[in-house]
Design a protein with these regions (language model features):
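Metal-dependent nuclease catalytic cores that hydrolyze phosphodiester bonds in DNA/RNA
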Residues: 1-84
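Conserved pre-motif I regulatory segment
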Residues: 174-216
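A substrate-engagement module of RecA-like helicase motors
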Residues: 186-187, 239-348, 356, 424-439, ...
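Walker A/P-loop
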Residues: 208-230
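Signature of the SF2 helicase/ATPase Hel1-core->accessory helical subdomain module
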Residues: 227, 254, 328-347, 351-456, ...
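Conserved RecA-like P-loop NTPase helicase motor core
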Residues: 571-583, 635-746
Length: 785
């Protein structure tokens, strides 16, 4: 049997094995201008070298080990001969003053040495020279460093380098063999519920055909295990290599961890990491990743490979506590260690942004020119529409430009000039803007921002680790975001200006349809599974999350008995803006009171906004309060501890508890209150988003596309919030409960068509009949039990 061959680029090899020093986020990034200047400088230097100089020479060399072959490949910037001797030329463009460089950077020299070894092997040379050429990107001043090596010296050095890499590859292949054996007899860990087998077979078929699938399956079906299990089996069958379980909220990451743990209890060998937000993994009070402010950043790169290798080879599950434990032991940054470890594991559980966000995505997996046999499982996929729009949109505020200019005076005249240029360009747009103004493109602002980025990168490199004011650094990231999104502009974008709160213009690059950008990311892998309890209507989500025409779709009905819950629509009440006032608030408060009086227990009432909630709560407490009913309410900006305390009330309550909450908020999805913890959800209104510039732009955009713009901008997003809120009730086969939809609009055809199939038994009620109807339902439940 042929040995497997692992291919790795020269650059990736040396940057991985030979990295050293500190973590420091104070330097600039490789922006477009620097890359363009670097390419021009390369070509200029190569063009000057004459006919004896060969530019961009492809080289590769395969080393055979007992278990695997490792092929190292890349392109040398130049190979030339001088006085009969071969020389490898490695060119690096920098903003720094090259005259101050005392020696080449170690990884740069190592790259050249790899090329020298391969070239010497090919040409059968006894010795070869290495030339490091450093060029300033602005002045084009050059500095050269030269060294000569014998074939023997290079051979010993190269073999040592490769042996250090081989230990990683050897363990990886041994682990995969063990992993795949563990999957051969792996069975679904539970008795299949209704609908689960349909999801499992649909997901497996999707992965095997390298397609995408949308799975609409209500709460209680067991979507998490029904998607993870077939994905794991597909990896075992060689249909994929890594699973990415993507979520929008922390709670769903925990559910995914539990699913993998259950499969491991049934014999699965699988390495699973959860990527936690940097702020939650940081040992410091403030995430300042530089050696001056963080002990863990100091010398991080000297130790991180040993830390990752030990953690990878001794553990199979990597949650926050495990990562912190090992980071402390090795004195490294836990977040960066986590990202490095992710490359070597079988499954990554993480937030959407680590795959989709152009500023945050995992470059180790999804960088330019990289791809893999990835299986994407996208949980709560309905959230990806708004998250996608957010990730793929950007803006520049003239107020921020002026503030940055003020701060830049002490640092760089070039930056001040570039910022003033952008300020003038934005001021021109400001004169033409009243409420908002749609533009064909960002115009000259794009070029101006590119120049600002170049000046800021230059400044960051020249500072040599000295800190910029935090506000100026934040503006730097804003500029980077703007330029990243500027590159993506197409027919899925609307460029517009609007006036900011401070009276200065804001130029926005608004992604109205994120499907094409999401598709570009998913193309880096093999297949994708979008699943949620609320992917209705499915065509809407397909349009906004995928550009493919061959996606599969599955609709799974609820496995729960309809007789265990009662759904009623209140037809004599409205949440319309035009109807809001004491009379309507009193009617809604009366509905709430009559509902909770019919049976002791815990209820949640969901409102379209905090203001609406507070107005109704005030009326309720003034006119309908009772000793046996306790009310609690959600507040804006609750932290994790406050959220947990709120939810604990539902476990501890013995009387009747009414939680006043906001639709689309932290309590309307992703929480499990089973059994008696929650027996009713009262939903006030249709969840329509507030009218605003972005929503109106969406409506107009989709109207022009020939579809109902109101549906796409308002009705569908609103109905999703309603369905999510309703999904808090009935979480298991044994649960009983009621769902009350309070708004006359729910009785209309436009909304009835959006109800899930299992709501077919929905009834209507009025304020006069609701107590009797709910009373009959609870009586029937008591008699049955």
């Amino acid at each position: 049997m042929d040995k497997p061959v692992v291919r790795i680029s020269v650059r990736n090899l040396v940057e991985f094995i030979l990295r050293s020093g500190d973590l420091d986020n104070r330097g600039g990034s490789s922006d477009r201008e620097a890359m363009q200047k670097g390419s021009r400088l390369h070509r200029k230097i190569q063009g000057r070298m004459g006919s004896h100089y060969r530019a961009e020479v492809s080289l590769k060399y395969k080393t055979e080990y007992e278990d695997v072959g490792i092929q190292v490949e890349g392109r040398a910037d130049g190979i030339f001969t001088e006085d009969g001797q071969y020389w490898i030329d490695e060119i690096k463009g920098v903003y720094a003053d090259v005259s101050q460089l005392e020696k080449p950077v170690e990884v740069h020299r190592a790259q050249a040495m790899c090329y020298a070894w391969i070239c010497a092997q090919e040409q059968k040379l006894e010795k070869i020279g290495v030339q490091m050429t450093y060029g300033n990107l602005d002045t084009e001043e050059l500095k050269f460093f030269r060294e000569e090596y014998t074939l023997e010296e290079l051979g010993l050095w190269y073999q040592n380098l490769l042996d250090r890499y081989h230990k990683w590859i050897a363990y990886q292949f041994a682990w995969k063999k063990e992993r795949n054996v563990s999957m051969s007899d792996l069975e679904f860990p539970f008795e299949y519920r209704e609908g689960q087998r349909k999801i499992v077979s649909g997901v497996y078929h999707t992965i095997s055909t390298e397609r995408q699938i949308f799975v609409q399956a209500p709460t209680g079906v067991g979507k998490t295990m029904s998607t993870i299990f077939p994905a794991v089996r597909a990896v075992g069958a060689g249909l994929g290599e890594n699973i990415f379980y993507l979520t929008a909220k922390t709670i769903t990451r925990t559910v995914a961890e539990e699913a993998f743990s259950i499969l491991k209890e049934h014999g699965l060998k699988f390495k699973v990491i959860t990527i936690t937000a940097k702020e939650k993994l940081c040992f410091c009070d403030k995430t300042e990743c530089n050696p001056e402010n963080c002990l863990w950043a100091r010398g991080h790169l000297d130790r991180v490979n040993d830390a990752v290798f030990e953690l990878w080879t001794t553990q199979d599950s990597y949650d926050r506590d495990t990562l912190l434990e090992y980071a402390k032991k090795w004195q490294v940054c836990p977040f960066e260690m986590c990202l490095d470890l992710a490359v070597w594991v079988d499954a990554v559980i993480c937030d959407y942004n680590y795959v989709f966000d152009p500023n945050v995505y995992l470059k180790r997996f999804f960088g330019e020119g990289t791809s893999g046999e990835y299986i994407f499982l996208i949980d709560e996929a309905h959230n990806l529409v708004d998250r996608g729009r957010e990730m793929y949109s950007a803006y520049v505020d003239r107020a921020d430009v002026l503030e940055a200019k003020k701060l830049a005076v002490d640092y760089s005249k070039g930056l001040v000039r570039a910022l003033e240029k952008v300020n003038r360009q934005l001021r021109t747009l400001e004169k033409e803007c009243t409420e908002y103004e749609i533009l064909p493109n960002p115009g000259a602002v794009s070029l101006g921002m590119l120049q600002v980025m170049g000046e800021m990168d230059k400044l960051l490199e020249e500072l040599h680790g000295k800190e910029l004011p935090e506000q100026l650094l934040e503006f730097y990231f804003c500029v980077r975001d703007f330029l990243n999104i500027d590159e993506l502009l197409d027919e899925n974008y609307v460029v517009y200006t609007e006036m900011g709160e401070g009276g200065k213009v804001i130029l926005r690059l608004f992604c109205v349809n994120p499907a094409a950008n999401i598709h570009r990311c998913l193309e880096k892998g093999k297949s994708a599974v979008f699943f949620s309890a609320t992917l209705l209507p499915m065509d809407y989500y397909r349009t906004l999350l995928s550009t493919r025409k061959d996606d599969y779709g599955i609709y799974v009905t609820s496995p729960f008995r309809q007789e265990n819950r009662c759904i009623l629509t209140g037809r004599d009440v409205s949440s319309r803006y035009t109807r809001r006032g004491y009379e309507e608030y009193h009617r809604i408060a009366s509905y709430i009171a009559r509902t909770v009086w019919t049976r002791k227990g815990n209820y949640m009432v969901f409102f379209p906004s905090y203001k609406f909630m507070e107005d109704v709560l005030e009326v309720y407490e003034n006119e309908f309060s009772a000793e046996w009913v306790r009310c609690i309410s959600q507040t804006s900006g609750m932290n994790e501890r406050e959220k947990e305390e709120f939810l604990e009330e539902f476990s501890a309550s013995e009387g009747t508890l009414v939680g006043f909450c906001v639709m689309g908020g932290i309590f309307s999805e992703g929480i499990d209150l089973m059994g008696e913890k929650l027996i009713g959800a009262i939903i006030i209104g249709t969840g329509l988003p507030q009218i605003g510039t972005e929503r109106e732009i969406l409506r107009q955009y989709y109207d022009k596309k020939g579809v109902n713009g109101f549906d796409y901008a308002y009705r569908y997003p609103g109905m999703n919030k309603v369905l999510q809120s309703a999904g808090r009730v009935i979480r298991t086969q044994e649960d009983t409960g009621i769902i009350l939809l309070l708004d006359e609009r729910f009785a209309g055809k436009d909304y009835r068509n959006l109800f899930p199939a299992e709501w077919s038994d929905r009834g209507n009620c009025t304020l006069n009949t609701v107590e009797e109807q709910l009373g009959s339902f609870w009586k029937r439940i008591r008699e049955k039990n």
